[in-house]
Swiss-Prot record:
Family indicated by similarity: Belongs to the AIR synthase family.
Protein's UniProt name: Phosphoribosylformylglycinamidine cyclo-ligase
Highest classification ranks of the organism: Archaea, Methanobacteriati, Methanobacteriota, Methanomada group, Methanopyri
Pfam families: AIRS (PF00586), AIRS_C (PF02769)
GO molecular-function term, one example from the UniProt record: phosphoribosylformylglycinamidine cyclo-ligase activity
Naturally occurring in which organism (per UniProt): Methanopyrus kandleri (strain AV19 / DSM 6324 / JCM 9639 / NBRC 100938)
Record's catalysed reaction(s): 2-formamido-N(1)-(5-O-phospho-beta-D-ribosyl)acetamidine + ATP = 5-amino-1-(5-phospho-beta-D-ribosyl)imidazole + ADP + phosphate + H(+)
Cellular compartments annotated: Cytoplasm
Amino acid sequence: MSEMTYKDAGVDIDKEAFAVRAIRDVLEKYKVEPEGCREVEGIGHYAAVLEVHGELLTLNVDGVGSKVLVAQLVGRYDTVGIDAIAMNANDAVCLGARPLAFLDYLAMEDPDPDVCAEIAEGLGKGAREAGAPIVGGELATLPEVIRGKEEGRGFDLVVACLGRVEGDPITGEDVEPGDAIVGLRSSGIHSNGLTLARKVLLSEYDVHDELPHGRTVAEELLEPTRIYVRPVMEVLRDYEVRGIAHITGGGVENLKRLRDDVRYVLDDPFEPHPVFEIIRELGNVPVEEMYRTFNMGMGMALIVPEEEAEDVVDTVSKHVEAKIVGHVEEGRGVVVHMDGHEVKL
């Protein structure tokens, strides 16, 4: 296969950034501030932060992207709900917020009760792991809008999250050179880069085929996104955390969402999961593209004072694999050292 990028697969993240900027610029003209409600952090971060009568609340919304297509191909629907909750819960904790409640929006080509029940199973499991209930939602039947890989099976799934911050929100502005970067291991691909992963893997394998490392394509593509609420909340209780990055769309470049005037050096990153190397080799995907598309083994990063880093690792490791993956220094961008190679982003 000739060299393939996320853009070649149909997703242009640079174009997306311009589109978001266009939306944000228009919405700025219509901004209102209700009595008793003040915007503390707005469009651009992982979640908005609102001060409502003295309480700091967060709001965010996200979906699971083209992972729904894999669910349709496989005929398995009980995992994508976990992803939908995870994407939102993990974004909320990046501001230091504990999720309070979720809403879901399910748009379907045909509202099959059995499929809906499977999707709800995943939503329920995810919400329980995140420690907050699903308090409402919307089911829309849109046969002219939603088209599936399998006739009648098309759907899209979106979740919104309400959270609460105790103390000051964590925006990343306190990150400084000398800080340590603690990485939290991902469970796999999670919910970003699925379009590229799916197109590369399915160019060579059937969705039920076994990959060289023993897992099937379906298992890798549908592996649920890990939910990091519990370990992060425990760390926030006992240690100073200066920035939290959910490694989603854009890969490790998400670190730059915290402060973009410092350099994040990953000199001891996690070994990527085997599926990432298969995608890279099979799709002839440049290493730089891999790190700006996928999480490459790290689902979340905590920026903490260097002297607290080992204790933070010990705390997180009670829940999920963690280690010090790098540090912050003077400069700009993200640098990854992997197998003797240096990747600059």
